């Protein structure tokens, strides 16, 4: 449109110029022609075209004219030819030549001008294009420099500017196309390097996880130490008001608390490094920014989470020897804490890379694995100190992660499982302690030679006896050395159990209940078992058993002081809160019963040993007139033993004495009726009667006080009536009154009488070969045979009745 308008504007001008050329003298044509070249750059071409058109018009007119004047032209030509030789001389020819020469210079100058104008225009265009391209080249050079310096985020921003701002301006140039083709490759290189950098950064984070966790756990422990120190100081003030018999060990342990608190406060002053101080997160941030700028955050998030989950699995997999030392558990916990502290840091400093839902899912997965690992490896721990240190680590571990918002209730539930295991290890340890105490005890009353020694024992064991206090030195405590040691060790066990119950976020009531239950286990399972094993040991004699019974009595009385001791350290009132009672009463009562039974057994065994020394001449004609030596030794032994029994409770001594007499009576009866004994003379019966009389005298001498009347003598009533029957030979009375409640020989068994009578009958036959020639002997023999028949009838009747 613009060209057409321009053309319309130049037509009248060209016509004017043509008119001037046609109407102007030839010498003045130069300025007119110059005006043509001064106009538009291509105007001379159009002018030439116009000139040609004008020439053609004139040619046509000339042709018309020539056609009109053709004949005349022919004639003129003919005439001209005639004058051709002279035409060159004409001035027109010379003028035309000069005109042509002058026009050539103008044409040359015109062409030079056109060429200069084109060059000028090209230079201007080049300058403009260079000014447009230079920023692109500079930005691309800047991009290359940023890539070489690994400033990828800045390079990415530069790349965006190139694509959005600079490249559209020069998109028509080939170099721009080449640059644009390199951008995807640069992006790919950038992403690959970022991934490599991220992988290295994540590996560095993993390597520093233990230091991060150690710093976090240390910080959590320091924050907790101050409050714990204050609480312990308050407990110390309360402990100083406790009863002297209940808090001796407590006060000794409480004296350490202020120093410990000061140490904790000194540690609080130390600077704790943060996670930013320990780990360089720039690779993560850089990669996140780059992928965010690329619009591919999801790929980066998936890659990051995938890599961190792999690291989590590595962290959660402990070494096989983790259970051997506390350092193994500490490294395991610090790595886990470091891992989740990093995740929490990423959660709070980034948007969307890590979400709360993701961290909770990861924590739940990790928590299940941690619990499984701890449950498996802690089962190998047999050292209570190691289990306690493990518990402290778990508490610090849980408190640390709880401070970062992770739920840790399942860890404290696990601690209750470990607490049972800890109690089991404590019970095993204290079983060894109790065994050592019992092995080292001399089972004799504790001798006291001075007031200081008396106070030492009183400070270790709650013993109150006004009569003993009034006695002068030297004197003896009724219990042996093991009693205060056992009491102290039970309190030490309570302390050891309390150490595990601390920091479990449980109320004082729950802690009190746990202490009482664990103490009950110690008493009912361990101490009771140790006592029973001690009682059943072969080398434990009657004196030791008596002392054990006395010891258990005092330990049973001390149980109320143990209950008060637990109440004091937990600050729980038994009146306001229902508390578990200690089972010391039943524990020591069972041990006493076992010791009493063992006393009865060993006493009977000792009686059997003496009875086995008996050496009767069952065919003697007359007795020696004095009791057998073995029996007198036995009675003397029983007297000395029962003197030791004076320290026992009355019923125990009475039962032991009655049991011994009954066993002695039974043993003598069995000796008399032994089937291997075929013959017994009346002299042997008389000798045996003398021994039984000594037994009756011993029973009537009240070797143990507390028996009423002849209660103890009744133990020998069966022997006495049987021997009286044979000594008096009162068979008519026995047979006549048999079965009557008021019978004189009510305790004589027909079978026993028959057995003994048959032994005596055989002796009579053997010793009285000529008895058949004496009437009295024949009558006695007939009486024996008659009595034997009647006794056999009674025995048969008893069997049928049964």
Swiss-Prot record:
Gene3D superfamilies documented for this protein: Dsl1p vesicle tethering complex, Tip20p subunit, domain D (1.20.58.670), Exocyst complex subunit Sec15 C-terminal domain, N-terminal subdomain (1.10.357.30)
Transmembrane stretches, start-end: none
Protein name: Exocyst complex component 6
Keywords: Cell projection, Cytoplasm, Exocytosis, Protein transport, Transport
Any one cellular-component term (Gene Ontology): plasma membrane
This protein's record includes keyword Thylakoid: no
Lineage, opening ranks: Eukaryota, Metazoa, Chordata, Craniata, Vertebrata
Complex and partners: The exocyst complex is composed of EXOC1, EXOC2, EXOC3, EXOC4, EXOC5, EXOC6, EXOC7 and EXOC8. Interacts with CNTRL. Interacts with RAB11A in a GTP-dependent manner.
Entries under PANTHER family matching the protein: EXOCYST COMPLEX COMPONENT 6, SEC15
Organism superkingdom: Eukaryota
Keyword Protein transport among record annotations: yes
Location in or out of the cell: Cytoplasm; Cytoplasm, Perinuclear region; Cell projection, Growth cone; Midbody, Midbody ring
One Pfam family matching this protein: EXOC6_Sec15_N
Family to which this protein belongs: Belongs to the SEC15 family.
Task performed by this protein: Component of the exocyst complex involved in the docking of exocytic vesicles with fusion sites on the plasma membrane. Together with RAB11A, RAB3IP, RAB8A, PARD3, PRKCI, ANXA2, CDC42 and DNMBP promotes transcytosis of PODXL to the apical membrane initiation sites (AMIS), apical surface formation and lumenogenesis.
One annotated GO biological process: vesicle tethering involved in exocytosis
């Amino acid at each position: 449109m613009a060209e057409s308008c321009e053309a319309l504007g130049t037509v009248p001008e060209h016509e004017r110029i043509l008119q001037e050329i046609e109407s102007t003298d030839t010498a003045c044509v130069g300025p007119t022609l110059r005006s043509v070249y001064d106009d538009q750059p291509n105007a001379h071409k159009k002018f030439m075209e116009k000139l040609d058109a004008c020439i053609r018009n004139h040619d046509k007119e000339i042709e018309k004219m020539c056609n009109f004047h053709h004949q005349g032209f022919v004639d003129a030509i003919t005439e001209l030819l005639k004058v051709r030789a002279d035409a060159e001389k004409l001035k027109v020819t010379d003028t035309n030549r000069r005109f042509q020469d002058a026009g050539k210079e103008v044409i040359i100058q015109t062409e030079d001008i056109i060429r200069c104008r084109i060059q000028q225009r090209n230079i201007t265009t080049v300058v403009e294009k260079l000014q447009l391209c230079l920023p692109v080249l500079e930005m691309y050079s800047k991009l290359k420099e940023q890539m070489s310096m690994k400033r990828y985020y800045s390079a990415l921003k530069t790349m965006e500017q190139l694509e959005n701002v600079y490249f559209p301006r020069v998109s028509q140039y080939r170099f721009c196309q080449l640059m644009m083709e390199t951008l995807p490759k640069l992006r790919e290189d950038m992403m690959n390097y970022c991934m490599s950098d991220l992988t290295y950064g994540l590996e560095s984070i993993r390597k520093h996880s233990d230091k991060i966790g150690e710093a976090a756990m240390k910080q959590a422990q320091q924050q907790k130490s101050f409050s714990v120190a204050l609480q312990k100081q308050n407990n110390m003030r309360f402990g100083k008001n406790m009863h002297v018999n209940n808090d001796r060990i407590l006060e000794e342990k409480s004296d350490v608390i202020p120093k410990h608190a000061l140490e904790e406060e000194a540690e609080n002053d130390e600077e704790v490094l943060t996670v930013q101080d320990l780990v360089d997160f720039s690779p993560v941030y850089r990669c996140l920014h780059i992928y965010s700028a690329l619009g591919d955050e999801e790929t980066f998030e998936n890659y990051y989470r995938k890599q961190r989950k792999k690291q989590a699995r590595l962290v959660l997999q402990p070494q096989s020897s983790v259970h051997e030392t506390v350092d193994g558990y500490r490294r395991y916990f610090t790595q886990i804490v470091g891992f989740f502290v990093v995740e929490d840091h990423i959660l709070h400093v980034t948007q969307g890379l890590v979400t709360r839902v993701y961290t909770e899912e990861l924590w739940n997965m990790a928590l299940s694995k941690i619990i499984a690992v701890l449950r498996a490896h802690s089962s190998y721990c047999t050292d209570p100190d190691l289990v306690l240190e493990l518990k402290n680590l778990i508490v610090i571990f849980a408190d640390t992660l709880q401070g970062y918002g992770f739920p840790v209730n399942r860890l404290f539930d696990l601690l209750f499982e470990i607490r049972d295991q800890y109690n089991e290890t404590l019970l095993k340890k204290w079983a060894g302690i109790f065994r050592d105490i019992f092995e080292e005890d001399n089972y004799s009353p504790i001798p006291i030679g001075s007031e200081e020694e008396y106070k030492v024992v009183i400070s270790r064991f709650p013993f109150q006896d006004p009569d003993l206090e009034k006695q002068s030195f030297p004197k003896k405590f009724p219990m042996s050395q093991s009693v205060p040691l056992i009491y102290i060790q039970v309190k030490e066990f309570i302390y050891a159990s309390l150490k595990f119950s601390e920091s479990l976020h449980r109320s004082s009531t729950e802690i009190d209940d746990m202490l009482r239950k664990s103490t009950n286990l110690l008493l009912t399972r361990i101490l009771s078992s140790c006592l029973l094993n001690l009682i059943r040991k072969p080398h434990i004699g009657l004196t030791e058993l008596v002392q054990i019974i006395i010891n258990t009595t005092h330990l049973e009385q001390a149980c109320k002081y143990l209950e008060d001791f637990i109440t004091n350290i937990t600050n729980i009132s038994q009146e306001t809160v229902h508390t578990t009672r200690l089972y010391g009463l039943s524990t020591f009562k069972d041990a006493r019963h076992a010791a009493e039974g063992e006393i009865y057994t060993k006493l009977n065994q000792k009686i059997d040993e003496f009875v086995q020394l008996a050496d009767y001449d069952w065919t003697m004609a007359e007795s020696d007139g004095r009791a057998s030596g073995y029996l007198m030794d036995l009675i003397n032994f029983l007297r000395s033993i029962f003197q030791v029994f004076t320290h026992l409770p009355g019923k125990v001594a009475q039962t032991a004495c009655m049991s011994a007499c009954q066993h002695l009576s039974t043993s003598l009866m069995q000796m008399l009726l032994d089937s291997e004994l075929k013959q017994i003379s009346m002299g042997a019966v008389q000798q045996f009667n003398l021994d039984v009389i000594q037994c009756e005298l011993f029973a009537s001498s009240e070797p143990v006080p507390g028996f009423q009347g002849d209660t103890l003598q009744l133990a020998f009533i069966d022997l006495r009536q049987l021997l009286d029957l044979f000594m008096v030979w009162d068979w008519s009375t026995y047979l006549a009154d048999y079965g009557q409640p008021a019978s004189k020989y009510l305790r004589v068994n027909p079978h026993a009488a028959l057995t003994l009578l048959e032994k005596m009958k055989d002796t009579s036959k053997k010793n009285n070969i000529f008895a058949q020639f004496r009437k009295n002997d024949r009558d006695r023999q007939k009486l024996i045979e008659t009595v034997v028949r009647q006794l056999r009838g009674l025995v048969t009747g008893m069997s049928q009745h049964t």
